[in-house]
Amino acid sequence: MRVGDVLEVRASAENLRAHRRGVQVDLVTEVSTGGELVYRGVSTYLAKGFRLPSGEEPLPEQTDEVPREDFVPPFPTARWALGSGTGRAYGAISGDRNPIHTSTLGAKAFGFPRTIAHGMYTAARALAEVGAARGDAYDWTVDFEKPVLLPGTVQVAITRTPDDAAHPGGFTYVGWNGKSGKRHLGGTVTPR
């Protein structure tokens, strides 16, 4: 992609399905230029407590949930100290001023004990921790688990993956709560 390229953007909701806790849907965004797909992003959302209109209940094999292995925190390579204003600061930049990120009262109304960090803030910060070694073009994945309560501290580990066909020169990253050992997020960065 170059400055001045005409971009074609397609967004869709796909794969509406029952989940044991509600309903899941994939929101897909694709960006093309000159007929070539240059970006594809898939975000999966869960609407807790909702059911499909058909009343369909998920069968165990339909849940799309892979049992997670017990998390054993690795040796941290970074530590983030996030202040209580992190959500407000990121919201001012991103435009996402959701009350769960900006107001303790708003966060409590949605079931959180205090404000939480934006998921994309933590994901982008982990990507930045990988640094320039990721290259200019890369595939990036992120899986969110437990929200980061603000103020809070996140332990982070960036690990280079073995050079193989699946992850040539890539990286994995994980962020967790150093006190509870609960994982906040994890993912991969693979240069193209």
What are these regions (language model features)?
Residues 1-79, 148-150, 157-192:
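HotDog/MaoC-like acyl-thioester-processing domains
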Residues 22, 34-37, 71-73, 81-84, ...:
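Residue-level signal for the start and early helices of compact helical domains
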Residues 6-10, 22-24, 58-61, 94-95, ...:
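A short linear-motif detector with a strong N-terminal bias
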Residues 41, 88-89, 124:
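Active-site-proximal helix/loop capping residues that flank conserved catalytic or ligand/cofactor
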Residues 100-101, 105-162, 169, 175-176, ...:
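Catalytic-pocket segment enriched in acidic/His residues
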Residues 45-117, 131:
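Catalytic strand-loop segment that frames the active site of acyl-thioester-processing enzymes
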